[in-house]
Structure formats: C-alpha cells, structure tokens
Regions:
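Amphipathic, hydrophobic N-terminal targeting peptides for secretion and organelle import
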Residues: 1-29
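Hydrophobic alpha-helical membrane segments, chiefly transmembrane helices and signal peptide h-regions
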Residues: 11-20, 39-48, 123-127, 157-159
C-alpha cells in the first residue's frame, strides 16, 4: 500500500528542487565559442598588421587613424591612441636588424591558435603572432605569444588591452616604450 505524501513533505521536496543548482550551471564553460573567438582574433590581428605595415617605407602611406571598430569589435580610445603612437614610431624604425640595415620591403602578420576565455564581463584571447618582414634578399620571422583583453557590455565587445606574454620577446612591430 502506498501512502500519500503529506502536503508539507511535497512542498519541501519541490522547494529543494528549486534551490538546487541546475546541471547547466554546473557545466558553465568559460571557453568562448569559435565564432566569437574568430571575431576577436580578426580584430586583434588588424591592429598588429597595421603596425607591421608601418615598418615598410611607403611614399604615399594611407594616413587614416586607427579604426574605432573592427569586425564588430570596438577599439577603446586608450588602445586606439596607443596604436597611433606605435604606428608613428614604427614608421621611423623601418630598417632590418642586420648589418647595414636595409629598409624593410614587406611585412605580414597573422594570429594563430587563438583561444578565448570569458570571466564575468572580461574575455581574454591568447594567440601566437607570426610576423614575417622582408628586406633586400632576406627576411626576419618572429613568433610571439600575445594576450588581448576585451570587455563586454551586453552584446558589445571592446578591446581594452594587449600585451606580449613572453618577457624576453622584442617584437619588431612593437614600439620601444612601455606605454602599451
């Protein structure tokens, strides 16, 4: 014979179910989905490529300012100002780091292996920057690990910081000063 649960017992069981965390909350993954990671990587790569291109001497350089948004990702005013300073400095440092220092003739940068993690309103993207700069009959290739920090507000994502992770790395497309 089955005894019916008293009303109070049933209420306690239902309340316990409501208070217990759901299994979805327990499996909350901090990794950012691949589409957003790609979006962040494109935005970060655009800034690095612009700095790399500043190393190559051009007679009629495109003098547009740093973008305020790339691929739907806003660039914070502080990061944009830092990028402008970096580009101006790099335009004057366009010699290969070899004896005789011929001028750079080409530069290409790409970010590979990007992995983004969300923590609260912050997304951190870590990736390897691969830069190739050409001069005369030679080239210099560098691989440097970088971290980019983004803040989110609703659906809007803003790039708020960037730094090199390897303490001894001296990327060719980075300004000399510590203001970044």
């Amino acid at each position: 014979m089955v005894r019916p649960w008293p009303g109070a017992g049933l209420a306690v069981v239902l309340a316990a179910c409501l208070v217990a965390p759901s299994s979805a909350a327990l499996r909350d993954d901090p990794d950012v989905d691949p589409d957003v990671t790609r979006q962040l990587t494109i935005a970060a790569n655009t800034l690095l490529q612009r700095r790399s291109e500043a190393l190559v001497q051009r007679h009629q350089r495109d003098r547009t300012s740093a973008p305020s948004e790339v691929y739907g990702v806003r660039i914070s005013p502080r990061v944009a100002r830092s990028q402008e300073r970096a580009v101006r400095e790099l335009e004057n440092r366009n010699r290969a780091p070899v004896e005789g220092g011929p001028a750079f003739t080409g530069a290409r940068t790409r970010l590979d292996g990007g992995h983004a993690v969300r923590e609260g309103d912050r997304i951190t993207l870590e990736a390897v920057e691969n830069t190739v700069v050409r001069y005369g009959s030679g080239e210099v290739t560098q691989s440097v690990r970088r971290r980019f920090v983004f803040r989110t507000r609703g659906q809007q994502i803003t790039l708020v910081g960037e730094r090199v992770l390897d303490p001894d790395a001296r990327p060719l497309n980075d300004p000399v000063g510590p203001d970044r």
